[in-house]
């Protein structure tokens, strides 16, 4: 700890008795040696709990208040700011004897005070003898509220934010012997040693041996095929043509039969005149579906030349034969290559 750090007495009183300053000089003689001074901060309530001391400038702080509840987390955080790492802190204030209706609204219990100290980062809390000379505020001395002056000593940790320190570990070797790292020093492992991060007093983990579950090979196993029912073994039924997505035409690789239904429907829509002498008002009907409008009767048909007969599959060809009286009288008609053969 630096030699120039001092001791701070903080209070909400207008002035501290001389006996309190003498007590501080006697108890912190080691910290006041080497040119360090004893400083007094009065009326901390009026200064909004802001201390004029610099950051990490005090080796010890003694906060003596006569108003209950002044040691709030915000004020204790300000005290931690002015304390050096490892500095001592004594807080003293009137506390409630036990949890009860608070007529003095700011009063808190000893447990609440210790909780505030822990939240502010202080450690090593212990109750010490109170400093004589600081009494309870008269505004809170009512017969219905039991208040006792209590002093709690604590210290600021010796490490700062971002500090790195070693964690004590337990080391075991192949022989089962254990050794520790001593006073939190790094452990250097030798060959065959392992590090155990569990606390020294922790119980060993329970080991579960599952290998015995597979030693008996004679046990009867369940055939997964026996779990299948007749419904599971049935082939799935393909959806009907109506189950296709609501598109204008069948899919490119249609397998549900919709393409055939559309072709039949298209063939039945064409009249004899449209088959024998196809015409087009737009001139694009014979170029294919890419050039046909949505209402074109030739949608789905292959390309053809306007003014020539349209042949689209066996059904359309059969319809065309039935519509021509002369050919229908010839009897059986077969199509071989590009020749039309009719039996009289």
From Swiss-Prot:
Residues 170-233 are annotated as: Linker. [4Fe-4S] cluster binds at residues 282, 285, 293, 296. One of its GO terms (biological process) is iron-sulfur cluster assembly. Residues 244-256 are annotated as: Fe-S binding site A. InterPro entries: Anamorsin, Anamorsin_N_metazoan, CIAPIN1, SAM-dependent_MTases_sf. GO terms for molecular function: 2 iron, 2 sulfur cluster binding; 4 iron, 4 sulfur cluster binding; electron transfer activity; metal ion binding. One of its GO terms (cellular component) is cytoplasm. Monomer. Belongs to the anamorsin family. This is Anamorsin homolog 1. It comes from Physcomitrium patens.
């Amino acid at each position: 700890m630096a030699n120039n750090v001092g001791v701070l007495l903080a209070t909400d009183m207008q002035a501290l008795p001389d006996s309190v300053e003498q007590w501080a000089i006697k108890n912190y003689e080691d910290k006041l040696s080497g040119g360090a001074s004893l400083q007094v901060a009065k009326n901390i309530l009026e200064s909004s709990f802001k201390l004029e001391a610099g950051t990490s400038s005090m080796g010890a702080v003694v906060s003596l208040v006569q108003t209950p509840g002044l040691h709030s987390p915000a004020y204790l955080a300000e005290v931690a700011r002015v304390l050096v790492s490892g500095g001592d802190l004594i807080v003293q204030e009137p506390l409630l004897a036990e949890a009860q209706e608070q007529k003095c609204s700011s009063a808190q219990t000893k447990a609440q005070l210790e909780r505030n100290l822990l939240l502010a980062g202080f450690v090593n809390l212990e109750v010490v003898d109170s400093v004589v000379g600081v009494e309870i505020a008269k505004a809170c001395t009512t017969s219905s509220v039991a208040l006792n002056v209590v002093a709690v000593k604590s210290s600021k940790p010796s490490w700062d934010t971002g500090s790195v320190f070693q964690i004590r570990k337990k080391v075991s070797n192949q022989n089962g012997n254990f050794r520790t790292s001593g006073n939190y020093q790094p452990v250097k492992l030798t060959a065959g040693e392992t590090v155990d991060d569990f606390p020294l007093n922790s119980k060993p983990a329970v080991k579960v041996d599952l290998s015995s579950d597979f030693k008996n090979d004679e046990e009867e196993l369940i055939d997964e095929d026996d779990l299948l029912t007749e419904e599971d073994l049935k082939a799935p039924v393909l959806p009907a043509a109506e189950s296709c997505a609501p598109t204008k035409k069948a899919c490119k690789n249609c397998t549900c039969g919709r393409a055939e239904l559309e072709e039949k429907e298209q063939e039945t829509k064409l009249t004899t005149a449209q088959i024998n002498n196809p015409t087009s008002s737009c001139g694009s009907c014979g170029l294919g579906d890419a050039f046909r409008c949505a209402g074109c009767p030739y949608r789905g048909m292959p390309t053809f030349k306007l003014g020539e007969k349209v042949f689209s599959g066996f059904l359309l060809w059969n319809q065309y034969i039935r519509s021509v009286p002369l050919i229908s009288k010839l009897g059986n008609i077969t199509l071989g290559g590009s020749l039309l053969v009719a039996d009289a």
